[in-house]
Regions:
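Thiol-/selenol-based redox modules, centered on thioredoxin-like
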Residues: 105-134
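Active-site acidic short loop of glycosyltransferases
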Residues: 16-17, 48, 97
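C-terminal structured domains
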Residues: 14-15, 42, 89-92
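Conserved redox-active cysteine motifs that mediate thiol-disulfide chemistry
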Residues: 24-41
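Short, internal strand/loop/helix patches
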Residues: 3, 66-108
């Protein structure tokens, strides 16, 4: 749980002391899918850094989600999740998640530091992550 965003529960032991970058996406979202190659590149660029990349799909169709994961090469990432109860969940309401793609950044203390972080294809994301990794 985070103090700044108590409705999102991050696995504390697994992510303790790490930056956490969350990508909300869906199989039917063309901009989300177009950003996936950049997301994979960003993940590889920071593979030895103290950061966790989490992908949360708001798909309602499980099979479409699985196919998109396979097509985009996310099926090997253990931090890839299918959201439940979208859009009725309190989490989505609190985040005002009215559109995707949407990116969140939590610092190493579990505090939400960017509710609308730059996307993986945005040139600003690397400098932002580097700033928090120092």
């Amino acid at each position: 749980m985070t103090r700044a965003c108590p409705w999102i529960h991050l696995p504390e032991k697994q992510n303790q002391g790490k930056l956490v970058y969350i990508d909300f996406w869906a199989s039917w979202c063309d901009p989300c899918r177009a950003a996936m190659p950049s997301a994979k590149k960003l993940c590889k660029e920071y593979i030895n850094e103290n950061i966790v990349f989490i992908y949360i799909s708001i798909d309602k169709d499980y099979n479409q989600w699985v196919k998109a994961m396979e097509d985009d090469g996310l099926n090997t990432n253990s931090n890839n999740f299918l959201a439940l109860n979208y859009p009725g969940s309190k989490m989505y309401e609190k985040l005002k998640l009215s559109g995707i793609p949407r990116y969140l950044l939590y610092d190493e203390n579990g505090e939400l530091v960017h509710q609308n972080a730059p996307g993986p294809s945005d040139g600003q994301i690397s400098s932002l992550l580097d700033e928090y990794l120092q």
